[in-house]
Amino acid sequence: MIPILDNKDASAPSVFRPAALLREARRQKGLAAADIPAICILDPDGDIVRHIMRTGEAQPFKAWPCYHTRLDTFTLAGQTAGIVGCAVGAPFAVLVAEELFACGCRLLLSLTSAGQIAPAGLPPYFVLIERALRDEGTSYHYAPPSEYAEADPALAAAALAAIEREGLHAIAGASWTTDAPFRETLAAIEAAKSKGVLAVEMEAAALYAFAKAAGVRILCFAHVTNTMGQTGGDFEKGEADGTADALRILAAIVRSGVAGSANAPAQTPI
């Protein structure tokens, strides 16, 4: 069997756990254990992080023990949220997500820029990812083979309703999660388009597979900003590098109370 599917048993416990890594990181760095905010954001592009650092809203979470990333906090819709920038791609995003949930996160929202597959408007616009094609490797460590990894339908529906109540716009639909953005061939694009896939990104399938396996709450958004460089003037995100609209979407979810159950007792990640 090919390695990507060989020796995969999503029901078997892992020998190496985030708690062990975090324990040793704290020991080496002289950090005390501390719960992070219940609501956290993954910002693969780093635009939101850079924006809140420029405006002075970001506060470093000094007890964050991760070897690879920085965790900042800021106020979002009246609540303290954590945010990690530039964790691009499925392996990195899930590594960080594992650590976030091990440190007290209860709801993780991921918002990344994405390429347009089946047109649903003129970019930029947002897609709430209901399901993601599993064209990456990480998800197969968390779930048996399948075509898609899916969002929690109740969480997705509640978030979409919250966005619409505030007069904002997001389209619910499918994405294609790839590991190789510069290998998006015409045949692969057309195949995804034939399935009604709206966007291509690099994290959602793996995050959803992890969420289901671990019993944690994750919701992913694609900010469709480009046609993969096929036209001039591509990759324009909007006001303040797209952060104005992105923060409105995220704030609508937090303000609605959808995130309120983020304060429920934590699940223990697998």
For every predicted segment, state its role:
Residues 1-107, 115-270:
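Accessory terminal and edge-of-domain segments that mediate assembly/interaction
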